[in-house]
Amino acid sequence: MKPMTMTDLNQLKKEKRKFATITAYDASFAHLFAEQGIDVMLVGDSLGMTVQGADTTIPVTVEDIVYHTRCVRAGTPYTFIIADMPFMSYATPEQSCENAAKLMRAGANMVKLEGGSWLYDTINMLTERSVPVCAHLGLTPQSVHILGGYKVQGRDEVSANQLIKDAITLEKAGIQLLVLECVPVDLAKRITDELQIPVIGIGAGNVTDGQVLVMHDTLGITVSPPKFVKNFLEEAGNIRDAIRLYKEQVESGIYPGKEHSFY
């Protein structure tokens, strides 16, 4: 089996073929997801809430992400793995390099950082040192206390223009992927069309190049799930078919539908 690479993901964008991504935290589920054709997985700091039972992602440590990245890599040798850099793990350039190296050694293909234009120097430094970077804009869960909760971002002209500016700036800094969370569909389309790199949406409509969901959300485990979530297990009947259905509906553009999107 051929490993998934950024070259492949860039080609998918060029061909306007959508791809599905899912969070993974252990070897067993990672193997199951790979069997269903999921080629990109995110070891997300969402594990703080889904696995550890915290109210936010803030308590998650680098060591937590390292541990779960190793577990996921053990379950799927060919998958493209993105590992979250958790809260305050990239506050300084030195810290960023040290922690990114830990995640790459654990089996990640790329690290993900939350934040806008202020990350330019950090991203530039990491990419110059051969660390592929994914940025995360829109609703950034590590900033939940500053944002005042989990709210849709970019609804007014000023904030929308800032997100567009941030996306362009971060692409110039060297990011190779962008996650765009909880923004209106029209803004997601503007950013996706503007950038040369693939954009992965979550709560951003079906106009992005790819989609990502927390695995617990796809399987209907989450209590009071967000609007953009669909319970694929309810329709499919078993976990394997649920993941396959998620992948198929993302690739065909069926999911997310209007009922899962913000306008």
Curated annotation (Swiss-Prot):
For the protein in the UniProt heading, the enzyme class is transferase
Question: Which keywords describe this protein according to UniProt?
Answer: Cytoplasm, Magnesium, Metal-binding, Pantothenate biosynthesis, Transferase
Q: What is its EC number?
A: 2.1.2.11
A cellular component term from Gene Ontology for this protein is: cytoplasm
Q: Where in the cell is it found?
A: Cytoplasm
Cofactors: Mg(2+)
- InterPro entries (alphabetical): Pantoate_hydroxy_MeTrfase, Pyrv/PenolPyrv_kinase-like_dom, Pyrv_kinase-like_dom_sf
Catalytic residues (positions): 181
Residues recorded as binding Mg(2+), renumbered to this chain, are 45, 84, 114
Report the Pfam families cross-referenced here.
Answer: Pantoate_transf (PF02548)
Q: Which GO terms describe its biological process?
A: pantothenate biosynthetic process
Pathway linked to the protein: Cofactor biosynthesis; (R)-pantothenate biosynthesis; (R)-pantoate from 3-methyl-2-oxobutanoate: step 1/2
Q: How is the cofactor bound?
A: Binds 1 Mg(2+) ion per subunit.
In which broad location class does this protein mainly occur, judging by the first location in its UniProt entry?
cytoplasm
Q: Which SUPFAM superfamilies match?
A: Phosphoenolpyruvate/pyruvate domain (SSF51621)
Which is an annotated GO molecular function term of this record? magnesium ion binding
Please give the PANTHER family that the UniProt record associates with this protein: 3-METHYL-2-OXOBUTANOATE HYDROXYMETHYLTRANSFERASE (PTHR20881:SF0)
Q: How does it assemble?
A: Homodecamer; pentamer of dimers.
Q: What does this protein do?
A: Catalyzes the reversible reaction in which hydroxymethyl group from 5,10-methylenetetrahydrofolate is transferred onto alpha-ketoisovalerate to form ketopantoate.
The family line of this record is: Belongs to the PanB family.
Know the name of this protein? Answer: 3-methyl-2-oxobutanoate hydroxymethyltransferase
Native organism taxonomy: Bacteria, Pseudomonadati, Pseudomonadota, Gammaproteobacteria, Enterobacterales
